């Protein structure tokens, strides 16, 4: 569950704080688990909600509310992704603006719908879609830049 919290945090310490807050909530709500679905899924949802609440409380989370039409963004080259270490991908995700990163995590990784994300974050469904589209676009540009300049390959060679 630390990995779940870390996707929303800016540092390991912040992720640990989120996780600790989440486990406190889990223990407080343990008697409400109804055995309808997996226990792990229930815990994961509490950790995600705790992380979002933590972000709102401590980082004054702000989202762009500008609504744009979603447009097709071609997928990044699989060669660029394959040549990168997990650490580099995690760093690219952490370098995204907080709003983009949060929506990307909730939609692409946690599997929430844009409607659910809008409700969770207090934004319009269309804003969630826009944030997700922008996050994908920014990640694609950064992946292409890494591939173009060979940064991933150079870093890979220096780790061998």
Positions of PLM-derived features:
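Sigma70-family region 2
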Residues: 7-10, 21-38, 57-59
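Arg/Lys-rich amphipathic alpha helix in sigma70-family domain 2
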Residues: 31-35, 45-65, 82, 134
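Structural recognition of an alpha-helix C-terminal capping motif at a helix-to-coil junction
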Residues: 3, 17-24, 37-49
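A short pre-motif secondary-structure segment
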Residues: 103-107
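C-terminal edge and immediately downstream basic/flexible tail or linker adjoining helix-turn-helix-like DNA-binding
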Residues: 119-122, 136-160
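Internal acidic/polar
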Residues: 53, 60-87, 113, 156-159
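C-terminal flanking helix
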Residues: 2, 23, 97, 101, ...
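Short, charged helix-capping/linker segments at alpha-helix termini
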Residues: 2-21, 125, 148-150
